[in-house]
Amino acid sequence: MKIALVSPYDFAHPGGVVNHILALDRQFTRMGHDVRVIAPASQGVPTIGDRFIPIGRPRPIPASGSICRITISLWLAPRIKKVLAREKFDIIHLHEPFMPMLCSAVLRYSETANIGTFHAYHGSPGYNFGWPISALILYRRRRKLMGKIAVSRPAMNFASNHIPGHYDIIPNGVDLEHFTPDVAPIERFRDGKVNILFVGRLEKRKGLDHLLKAYRQVKAEVPESRLIVVGPGTRLRKKYEKHVRRSGLKDVVFAGYTSYDELPRYYKTADIFCTPATGRESFGIVLLEAMAVGTPVVATNIDGYAGVMTQGKEGLMVPPKHDTELARALLLLMSDEPLRRQMGARGMATAQQYDWKKIARQVFELYIKVLSEPPWRRRFPEYDAVSASA
């Protein structure tokens, strides 16, 4: 089957949607399908080679305390028409159809079956820029979306307010061959200190300021502890580093951007993974990554995280923006190594449910279902639902 995966975001910059598409590309290619990724790109994308089709030049746009890298060109039509006519896709799978401008333009000129995956919800980065117009355009073209996927119930609730109808909830996945408990920890952090790990962009909504305040309380009670901050910097990084210096807080390591290959080693190095996001998260991908490696989690009890983990099972959940509660949860796990091991083992079991192999098969089954119905009524005997779920 020939499949197009369309991203509105700069494919040269890592992020949740980009990583999701890369995972589907890997799995579908392994299944024997002919996959192309269509997206804007600020530079080359060597990871997928000639399977990548660049359309549009992304621009960095400040949005919701983040940077949204999308193409806002109104002159995409000639390139889109040429690509669609040449490639003749069986399925076009649009990711974040609400985001301007690429997905709505591809949908306009598509003459094949179209699927949309809705990853985020109102308040997510970029959704205060352009999405009301895109939502109106998408509503007018909604009949061209033959299948709608939401990665979580919060994402579905938001999307269905604007594009009503049936949604299949198919979550994000985790690559269990990559995020594995068998990876080696980072040697320089193996000095007897209890390591707390944060992974994410240094944006206000990720809650690092609350973790720094909580860690100040933790450090006072457990001097032999360390906070490792992993993630691409933003304009807030200098502010956070200045706060750490002025407060005299020791053992806070800003590791900066870490490659996908190196990331599992950070999770393995951590005794506790902490994600204190304040909201606007439709799904907890970083939770799954930590769980897959066997690291217990301390997370805020927000909608996107509550759908992935259970309080007291894979870790502990606290109210968002409650620094003292966050510190208390961290201290509880730091003082109880058997509990950490127990929660880590439960997390690994939970992560098995989100194996990208399983998730990709669920998505592919929807492709088959859509193509077997009017107006397509196409049959792919070699890819029936039984073989897809094998």
Kindly give the residue locations of the regions a language model identified.
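Nucleotide-activated donor-binding/catalytic signature segment of Leloir-type glycosyltransferases, i.e.
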Residues: K238-T258
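Conserved acidic donor-binding segment of nucleotide-sugar-dependent glycosyltransferases
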Residues: Q311-G312, L316-D323, L332-E337
